[in-house]
Amino acid sequence: MAPPPGVGPASLRFAAAASWLVVRRRRVEHFPKVVEFLQSLRAAAPGLVCYRHHERLCMSLKAKVVVELILQARPWDQVLNALKHHFPAESRTTKEDRKLLEARENFCLLVKHLSEDPPSSLQELEQDYGESFLVAMEKLLFEYLCQLEKALPPVRAQELQDALSWSQPGSFITSSVALHQYGMDMGWTFPESSTSGSGNLIEPMEESPHQQTRPAFHSPLPKAKLGPHQPASLEHPEHLAGHRFNLAPLGKRKSRSHWTSAKACHKERPTVMLLPFRNMGLPAQDLSNPKSREEPGAASAASVGTEPVCTEEAKTPSRPLGKRALEETPPDSPAASRRTV
């Protein structure tokens, strides 16, 4: 899935289209190939997305691969070997970010605890790493690929055809399922003159009234359109990748849950949640105490009249109000002249 040398933007788009189709169709067995493509893309263009966005996406793909082996009841030796392969002990990828390092360590701890004391049911694990987890991952990938499309030159059908002929002689871009799906989700359009008689790769689609009234998914692509076959991650535009959506359970959770092991005993589950990373500027005590999240005005209003006000005048003996007023009034002021009359 890595781009072939010397082909250029078209090869990147083919690799991106293949990765996008793999994630959209939930082909977990091919997730490692998607990780390889993202790592090669990161090495070539590190400025497409931030470091945390890239690492969150790669960690999610790797975690799903390991979890899928557990759900398939593979031998624990195979699961632990996959864990060691995808999350090596001496990994420098997460040392730049404490949250990512914590998420990585806690996930490895979870898998090791499960191998030592397998639970009687994997329903909770399947739910945590189920469709909601995949939808959140799909959003991260979509935003990543949108940034890639912004960095690449405009799409040209002939360049795509040349790249496809280089890798698969005799094939045509109009028959590429991955490229067609990717083009629809990215909103590709081709002028009539650029197709050289091969026909438009992406035909314009009329939007239904429901699609016209629905808010558009925020995308860096100015011309991106959502067709009737849009991915599941684009059906909820209010949850944007990289903002506040839940990418559980790759980071620390606030709630405590337990696994029921096969030995009929309870064991604390070392779950973690990756998002949200930041506490929106609130102190740690504000997050744990709901009362402390009240409006600042309410707290200040309640404190009026209850806290002593320390001033320098409070240290001096009390004086009559009239005398003190005369002392504080400048001699040449109008108020002073009226008092002397």
UniProtKB/Swiss-Prot annotation:
It is found in: Nucleus; Chromosome, Telomere. Component of the shelterin complex (telosome) that is involved in the regulation of telomere length and protection. Shelterin associates with arrays of double-stranded TTAGGG repeats added by telomerase and protects chromosome ends; without its protective activity, telomeres are no longer hidden from the DNA damage surveillance and chromosome ends are inappropriately processed by DNA repair pathways. Plays a role in shelterin complex assembly. The modification N-acetylalanine is found at A2. A motif (Nuclear localization signal) lies at residues 249-255. GO terms for molecular function: telomeric DNA binding. Residues 283-341 are annotated as: Disordered. A motif (TBM) lies at residues 243-265. Monomer. Found in a complex with POT1; TERF1 and TNKS1. Component of the shelterin complex (telosome) composed of TERF1, TERF2, TINF2, TERF2IP, ACD and POT1. Interacts with TERF1. Pfam families: TINF2_N. The TBM domain mediates interaction with TERF1. InterPro entries: TINF2, TINF2_N. CDD domains: TIN2_N, TIN2_TBM. One of its GO terms (biological process) is negative regulation of telomere maintenance. It comes from Mus musculus. GO terms for cellular component: chromosome, telomeric region; nucleoplasm; shelterin complex. Keywords: Acetylation, Chromosome, Nucleus, Telomere. This is TERF1-interacting nuclear factor 2.
